[in-house]
């Protein structure tokens, strides 16, 4: 399925969380939190300002981003969990 976000919305695929801690301890699935970073799969054209001008998106397809824990709306595309969120919900681009 192909999904094209509108306006300032972004489609993000969550990246897998770490399997073990820095100290080498394995984290069981029941103790893992949903990861708060992901890869931008698609991005809309941007937000329309009050004066009618288009404000271009900062993020682009392929960017790895950090977002808040409760950001976006969860959807499944081809059996894979994704999030649709506004660009404002993205906290940072990881370089």
From Swiss-Prot:
List the Pfam families.
Answer: Cpn10
Query: Where is this gene product found?
Result: Cytoplasm
One annotated Gene Ontology cellular component of this protein: cytoplasm
Cite the InterPro entries for this sequence: Chaperonin_GroES, Chaperonin_GroES_sf, Chaprnonin_Cpn10_CS, GroES-like_sf
Q: Name one GO biological process term.
A: chaperone cofactor-dependent protein refolding
- Asked if Membrane is a keyword of the record, the answer is no
Q: Which GO molecular function entries does the Swiss-Prot or TrEMBL record give?
A: ATP binding; metal ion binding; protein folding chaperone; protein-folding chaperone binding; unfolded protein binding
Q: Does the keyword Chaperone apply?
A: yes
What does the UniProt keyword field contain?
Chaperone, Cytoplasm
Show the PROSITE patterns listed in the entry: CHAPERONINS_CPN10
Complexes and interactors: Heptamer of 7 subunits arranged in a ring. Interacts with the chaperonin GroEL.
What PANTHER family does UniProt report for this protein, alphabetically? 10 KDA HEAT SHOCK PROTEIN, 20 KDA CHAPERONIN, CHLOROPLASTIC
| Known function | Together with the chaperonin GroEL, plays an essential role in assisting protein folding. The GroEL-GroES system forms a nano-cage that allows encapsulation of the non-native substrate proteins and provides a physical environment optimized to promote and accelerate protein folding. GroES binds to the apical surface of the GroEL ring, thereby capping the opening of the GroEL channel.
Q: Which NCBIfam families match?
A: PRK00364.1-2, PRK00364.1-5, PRK00364.2-2, PRK00364.2-4, PRK00364.2-5
Q: Which family does it belong to?
A: Belongs to the GroES chaperonin family.
The name of this protein is Co-chaperonin GroES
Q: Which organism is it from?
A: Nitratidesulfovibrio vulgaris (strain DSM 19637 / Miyazaki F) (Desulfovibrio vulgaris)
Taxonomic path:
Bacteria, Pseudomonadati, Thermodesulfobacteriota, Desulfovibrionia, Desulfovibrionales
Q: Which gene encodes it?
A: groES
């Amino acid at each position: 399925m192909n999904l094209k976000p509108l306006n300032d919305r972004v489609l993000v695929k969550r990246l897998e969380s770490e399997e073990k801690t820095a100290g080498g301890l394995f984290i069981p699935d029941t103790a893992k939190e949903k990861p708060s970073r992901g890869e931008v799969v698609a991005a809309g054209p941007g937000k329309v300002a009050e004066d009618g001008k288009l404000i271009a998106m900062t993020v682009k397809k392929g960017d790895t981003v950090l977002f808040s824990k409760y950001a976006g709306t969860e959807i499944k595309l081809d059996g894979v969990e994704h999030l649709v969120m506004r660009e404002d919900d993205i906290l940072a681009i990881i370089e």
